[in-house]
């Protein structure tokens, strides 16, 4: 069910943005540790007037980062690249599955069992394709 109230839509959108950068939030926590250390250092040097502007700048920077990371297309591109890297190669399971599919389809078209020569030809062709694709293919980038 889609929300009808505007404030629900706004909150849901921001929660989706935050969820989109949840991996980056760990980096933000490290930044917060850095700000804490820097605020103590600034206080020790008598520059505590710079602490609140520093914290404010970090908060604004985090919101801007969340917005541009999700709405600017970075999040989508990261997920596309991850998908390309994780699915861009042939696995032994795919080799076995493809060989079984090829045998089944060819036997079905033929209407009878395959001969040993036909099985070897299918296996040889799939082995060649597997060797070509097991390390992945080069995915073209839109530049």
UniProtKB/Swiss-Prot annotation:
- Assign the protein's first listed, main location to one coarse class: host cell
Membrane topology per the entry is: Multi-pass membrane protein
The alphabetical list of record keywords is: Host membrane, Membrane, Transmembrane, Transmembrane helix
Transmembrane domains' residue ranges: 20-42, 52-74
Subcellular location per UniProt equals: Host membrane
Note the superkingdom of the native organism.
Viruses
The record's GO CC annotations read: host cell membrane; membrane
Q: Does the keyword Chloroplast apply?
A: no
| Protein name, UniProt field | Putative transmembrane protein ORF32
Q: What species is given as this protein's source?
A: His1 virus (isolate Australia/Victoria) (His1V)
Which classification does the entry list for the species?
Answer: Viruses, Viruses incertae sedis, Halspiviridae, Salterprovirus, Salterprovirus His1
């Amino acid at each position: 069910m889609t929300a009808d109230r505007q404030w629900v839509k706004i909150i849901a959108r921001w929660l989706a943005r935050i969820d989109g950068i949840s991996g980056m939030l760990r980096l933000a926590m490290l930044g917060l540790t850095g700000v804490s250390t820097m605020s103590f250092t600034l206080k020790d040097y008598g520059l505590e007037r710079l602490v609140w502007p520093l914290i404010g700048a970090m908060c604004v920077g985090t919101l801007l980062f969340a917005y541009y990371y999700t709405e600017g297309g970075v999040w989508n591109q990261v997920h596309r690249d991850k998908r390309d890297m994780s699915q861009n190669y042939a696995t032994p399971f795919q080799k076995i599955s493809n060989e079984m599919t090829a045998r089944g389809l060819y036997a079905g078209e033929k209407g009878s069992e395959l001969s040993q020569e036909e099985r070897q030809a299918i296996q040889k062709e799939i082995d060649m394709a597997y060797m070509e694709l097991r390390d992945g293919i080069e995915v073209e980038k839109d530049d």
